[in-house]
Swiss-Prot record:
The keyword Transferase does not apply. This is Large ribosomal subunit protein uL30. HAMAP family: Ribosomal_uL30_B. Belongs to the universal ribosomal protein uL30 family. One of its GO terms (biological process) is translation. One of its GO terms (cellular component) is cytosolic large ribosomal subunit. It comes from Bacteroides fragilis (strain ATCC 25285 / DSM 2151 / CCUG 4856 / JCM 11019 / LMG 10263 / NCTC 9343 / Onslow / VPI 2553 / EN-2). Keywords: Ribonucleoprotein, Ribosomal protein.
């Protein structure tokens, strides 16, 4: 499976608790941090849940 790089581009301040937990589960705790994950359905679902806070880096 391929990997994707995910970057947090917006602050988590003011976001609902479930979105904050999703960012934590992805390993994104600070702004402009990039993490790399396998492109599995569960990871893609988490990215979709916080798509307004993150960006996919090529």
């Amino acid at each position: 499976m391929s990997t994707i790089k995910i970057k947090q581009v917006k602050s988590r301040i003011g976001a609902p608790a479930d979105q904050k937990r999703t960012l934590d589960a992805l390993g994104l705790r600070k702004l402009n941090r990039v993490v790399e994950h396998e492109s599995t359905p569960s990871i893609l679902g988490m990215v979709d849940k916080v798509k307004h806070l993150v960006a996919i880096v090529k």
